Each structure stands twice: as C-alpha cells, then as structure tokens.
C-alpha cells in the first residue's frame, strides 16, 4: 500500500515448476498452451528509501526456466545500495563565507550480484563460491565546483571503483591439447580502478538589435558557453596492478601473444586497458529573440538551442590522437 509505506515498494510475479512436474502432470498433456510454454520466468523486487539518511536500497531475484532441457538461470540477490549526494565537510552551523572544502560532494553506489545457470535438479547441490557467479562493486565519485576569477566554473572530479571477486582465473596454452587451459583460484580478490578529471567553463553573453528591424522592439541574445576538460587514468593492464596477464598461443606454427584479465567474464567487468589522457574542447551556442507582441507583452523565442561543436586530443594515443570535429 503506497499510502501505508510511501518510501517502499514491493512486486512479485511467480511462474515456477520443476521439469519433472511438467512431464508427469496429466493436465498438461491435454493443455496445448501449457505444453508449448517453453520458458517460465519469476521475479520478486523490493525497494526502500530512507530520505533522512539520503539512502536507498533495492533488491530483486529472478528465475528463468527452460522446460525442454530443464535448465534454470537464477539471480538471487541482485541488490543495489545508493547514497545520494552529500557534502561531508559542510558545517551544520555555518559562520561567515563558505569554505572551499565544504563544496566537496560524495556519492556512493554499491551492488551485490549472485547468479547461476544449471539444471533445476542440481540447483541446491551447487557450491556458493565455486559454482555461483558472484561479486560486489563499489562506485564512489567525489567532486566539487568552484568559481575562479568570478567568471570561470572549475569542477574537479575523482572516480573510484572497487570490485570484489570470489575467483581468479589464470590462463595458459597447452601445446599437447592444442587449446587454452584454465587454473582457477577461489577466495577474496580485490580489484580497483580510478580516474580524475578537471572541467572549466564560462559563459559569454551578447545582446544586439537586428539592423533590418530597427523600428521594432526586438533584441537578440547570444549565449556562448566554451568549455575545456582534462581527464586521465593509468593503464590498468600494467603488471604493477596485477589484473592482466598474457600467454603465448602456438597453433599451426603461428605464435600469438594473448592478453587477458584474470577476472574477465564475471558478474562485474574488470578495469579496461589503455592509458588515458584526454583534453576536450567544446563550444555551445544558444540564440534567442525577445520582442513585444501586439498586446505589448514581452515574448521570447528560441532561435538556436544548444548548437555545439567539440574536438578532443588523446595525449596517450600513438595513432590518430585528434578526434573528429
């Protein structure tokens, strides 16, 4: 009931049956629709907001069954915890001007996911760590906006992401078998990445009266918003992080180096490779006309709305560092 619990929601849709029941249910033999229903899906979801704590929690569970081969895909739970933007250094009782560190804001999003694909008669025989795909991810962006020389808005941002895995897969090439082989280590594995950016923008205003309409009360307002941003991140395929490795694949006399991540294919993707050092330039234009109508009321009409152009330069790129305009 939304009125009884305005900060929480619950929903459920259940359509579940074991494959053995489907095969032995006499009623289904005479029900062509039931017999032709190859997939059954069930879902349950719950969410709750805590406005005073700037916190929200949502959780769901999903089951998808394929009756023909008795396979089942289960995700339980898939839970997200979100902390909306807070200013941890802001004083409760401010005196005087706002301090620079009071502008720093923090957000948090955490997600836990646990899933498996198996046969329905084997579901409860599976090991939680070895057979289920599970993990947790934390995302923490920290940012602030400052005014520089009265006219420039400066926004530094730092993004931090951390993943928790329960397995690490080392790969190699087996010459005798002629295929890739895996060596899996189970336990707690922590993987993180980070990036930083700095954005600067300002606004330039222009007002003028059209030369061809001097007798009418018409004004044109032109707003130009130039911006420049810098973003950087290290190469997380580097050996100093320990997230990636490589092996030599020797097949049909052709030797190739294969790079891979120990944590590829899991519920949360590992950090991407490649060093980043991007400088971006952008100009946005807005043009509007203000005039008096027949009733002497002032009206505004947008002539150009957010006409933008931009270009970027990747300082870490060896080939084609400039983007298209």
What annotation goes with each model-predicted range?
Residues 1-325:
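Outer-membrane beta-barrel proteins and related beta-barrel translocases across Gram-negative bacteria
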């Amino acid at each position: 009931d939304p009125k009884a619990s305005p900060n929480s929601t619950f929903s459920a849709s259940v359509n579940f049956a074991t494959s053995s029941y489907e095969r032995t249910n006499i009623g289904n033999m005479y029900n062509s629709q039931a017999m032709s229903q190859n997939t059954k899906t069930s879902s349950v979801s719950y969410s709750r907001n805590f406005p005073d704590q700037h916190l929200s929690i949502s959780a769901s569970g999903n089951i998808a069954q394929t009756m023909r081969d008795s396979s089942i895909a289960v995700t339980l739970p898939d839970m997200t915890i979100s902390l909306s933007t807070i200013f941890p250094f802001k004083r409760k009782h401010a005196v005087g001007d706002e301090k620079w560190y009071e502008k720093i804001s923090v957000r948090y999003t955490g997600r836990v996911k646990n899933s498996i694909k198996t046969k329905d008669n084997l579901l409860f025989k599976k090991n939680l760590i070895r057979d289920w795909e599970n993990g947790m991810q934390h995302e923490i962006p920290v940012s602030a906006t400052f005014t520089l020389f009265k006219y420039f808005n400066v926004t530094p941002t730092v993004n931090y992401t951390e993943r928790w895995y329960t397995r690490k897969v080392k790969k190699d090439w087996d010459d005798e078998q002629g295929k890739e082989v895996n060596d899996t280590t189970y336990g707690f594995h922590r993987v993180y990445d980070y990036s930083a950016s700095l954005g600067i923008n300002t606004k330039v205003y222009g007002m003028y009266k059209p030369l061809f309409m001097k007798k009418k009360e018409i004004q044109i307002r032109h707003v130009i918003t130039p911006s420049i941003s810098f973003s950087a991140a290290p190469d997380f395929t580097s050996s100093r992080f320990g997230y990636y490795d490589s092996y030599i694949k020797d097949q049909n006399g052709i030797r190739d180096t294969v790079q891979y991540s120990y944590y590829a294919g899991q519920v949360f993707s590992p950090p991407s490779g490649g060093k980043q050092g991007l400088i971006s330039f952008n100009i946005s234009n807005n043009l509007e006309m203000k005039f008096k109508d027949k009733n002497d009321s002032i009206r505004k009409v947008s002539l150009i709305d957010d006409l933008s152009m931009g270009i970027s330069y990747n300082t870490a790129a060896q080939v084609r560092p400039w983007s298209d305009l």
